[in-house]
Amino acid sequence: MSLFDTINSGGAQLLGVAWPTVWALVRILVVAVVILLCVAYLILWERKLIGWMHVRLGPNRVGPAGLLQPIADVLKLLLKEVIHPTAASRWLYLIAPVMTVVPAFAVWAVIPFQAGAVLANINAGLLYAMAISSIGVYAVILAGWASNSKYAFLGAMRAAAQMVSYEISMGFALVLVLMTAGSLNLSEIVGSQQHGFFAGHGVNFLSWNWLPLLPVFVIYFISGIAETNRHPFDVVEGESEIVAGHMIDYSGMAFALFFLAEYINMIVISALAATLFLGGWDAPFEFLSFIPGIFWLVLKVFALLSVFIWARATFPRYRYDQIMRLGWKVFLPVCVFWVIVVGFWMMSPLNIWK
């Protein structure tokens, strides 16, 4: 009997009918706390990695090797005043940061950490993740409009256009995964990548979706960078033009909530990419399957997050028209073409997803 089964049976005996609700709340709390810790140290890892790329040390003053820097940053933001512009729509202005964070947390309900370890194992998990993650664009528009600032509104309009443009390409990428897996359940999608010729010979990583759907995987990941308004797609908050975009009038914890949502969304994009294209919790080689699946998922997510950071340190910022051109004239046609290719592939005798 596993640890979770032991806790479940013991809790059911102790609390009776109230236990399922209590157990669900405990799991949600644990996942939320872990995500917050991951965000804190993802920011530290980003600053360290970019520092090394710039041939400098990065944060190294607070705690040993700078490991307490995230705590200092949180305390600083907690002690700052939340400024409310006189001309702003007060309640909408304050609701917008909350609206960005809630969907970012809600997506984690359907992401499986390993076999059987998921908060809500629903059959429409992929559809749920896509629908919930697209709500964030409304919060960005609301923040720009409620601030009653032309610079904030300009940044919000850029964000809305960019997010909508790249959501279409991401949607097509998810449709292709749905076609090959035959299911919207994320656990079943991971399971569908554990079969085939290569998996039968112990080379699991060659049976994952990244290989047959490589162009789509690349498009999905780049679109994810654009969706999260990360460099080189960060024209929304381009420092040389409109400073912080829709966040220009925010301060303190209201400002911090936008950044919290951005980094949670980075982890969500990486976790979904690992689940849909990189086998989720599956080990790359069969002889390594004794290692818990959550270790492999965390390793894959960490590698993808490092690519996010590498892109920030490496590429210059795109112009707004270049971003739109890439989304509509390159990614969208390639995705449509690949849908047709995979459709014919699946109907042919060479179908590898049987």
UniProtKB/Swiss-Prot annotation:
GO terms for cellular component: plasma membrane. Belongs to the complex I subunit 1 family. Keywords: Cell inner membrane, Cell membrane, Membrane, NAD, Quinone, Translocase, Transmembrane, Transmembrane helix, Ubiquinone. It comes from the Bacteria. This is NADH-quinone oxidoreductase subunit H. The keyword Transmembrane applies. It catalyses: a quinone + NADH + 5 H(+)(in) = a quinol + NAD(+) + 4 H(+)(out). It is found in: Cell inner membrane. It is a multi-pass membrane protein. One of its GO terms (biological process) is aerobic respiration. NDH-1 is composed of 14 different subunits. Subunits NuoA, H, J, K, L, M, N constitute the membrane sector of the complex. One of its GO terms (molecular function) is oxidoreductase activity, acting on NAD(P)H, quinone or similar compound as acceptor. InterPro entries: NADH_UbQ_OxRdtase_su1/FPO, NADH_UbQ_OxRdtase_su1_CS. Disulfide bonds: none annotated. NDH-1 shuttles electrons from NADH, via FMN and iron-sulfur (Fe-S) centers, to quinones in the respiratory chain. The immediate electron acceptor for the enzyme in this species is believed to be ubiquinone. Couples the redox reaction to proton translocation (for every two electrons transferred, four hydrogen ions are translocated across the cytoplasmic membrane), and thus conserves the redox energy in a proton gradient. This subunit may bind ubiquinone. Its EC number is 7.1.1.-. The chain crosses the membrane at residues 25-45, 91-111, 126-146, 170-190, 205-225, 253-273, 290-310, 330-350.
